[in-house]
Structures are given as C-alpha cells and as structure tokens.
Swiss-Prot record:
UniProt family annotation: Belongs to the Fe(2+)-trafficking protein family.
Organism in which the protein naturally occurs: Cupriavidus pinatubonensis (strain JMP 134 / LMG 1197)
Gene Ontology cellular component annotations, sorted alphabetically: cytosol
Protein name stated in the entry: Probable Fe(2+)-trafficking protein
Entry function: Could be a mediator in iron transactions between iron acquisition and iron-requiring processes, such as synthesis and/or repair of Fe-S clusters in biosynthetic enzymes.
InterPro entries in the record: Fe_traffick_prot_YggX (IPR007457), Fe_traffick_prot_YggX_sf (IPR036766)
SUPFAM superfamilies: YggX-like
Length: 90
C-alpha cells in the first residue's frame, strides 16, 4: 500500500514520495509533506530554471540557489519564475 501524505503544495491527501529526495532536514521535511505529483511539478520547474537561467550544476552557487528555490516552492512564497517564460494558453 502506498504511503499517503497531506500534500502542502496541492492541499490534498496524495501518494507520498518513496524516500527523502534530498539529504538533511529539507529532504526529510519534503518527504513528510510533499506528494509524488507535487514533486514531479517541482522537477519540471527546476529543469526550466536550470535551462532558462543557464545554471551550471557543477557550480556550488547554482546548487545553493536551487536548494533555496526548492524550499521557497514548497514552504515559502513560491520559487522564481524563469525569465522570459510565457505559459501556454489554455
């Protein structure tokens, strides 16, 4: 049976992650309160931030930036939007 969590991002009960996605306290916090669906949404947003901002993941500053954005995305006021990104029309 799947582990269920009250997802902080989607505001509903949903299937939780199988393991903490990051090391440390942030990973534990995400594992306890973020669903697989919300995590998949973050991975898409993270990819967009990396590509649009041309982040070099070998650079420690880029990795720290993404960790801060991860925390803001789930537990803060929301992550940065990629500069120049225009969402598709519905």
């Amino acid at each position: 049976m799947a582990r269920m969590v009250q997802c902080i991002k989607l505001n509903k009960e949903a299937e939780g992650l199988d393991f903490p996605p990051l090391p440390g306290e942030l990973g534990k916090k995400i594992w306890q309160s973020v669903s697989k669906e919300a995590w998949a949404g973050w991975l898409k947003h993270q990819t967009m931030l990396i590509n649009e901002n041309r982040l070099n993941m070998a650079d420690a500053r880029a990795r720290q930036y993404l960790l801060k954005q991860t925390e803001k995305y789930f537990f803060g006021e929301g992550a940065d939007e990629a500069a120049g990104y225009v969402p598709p029309q519905a």
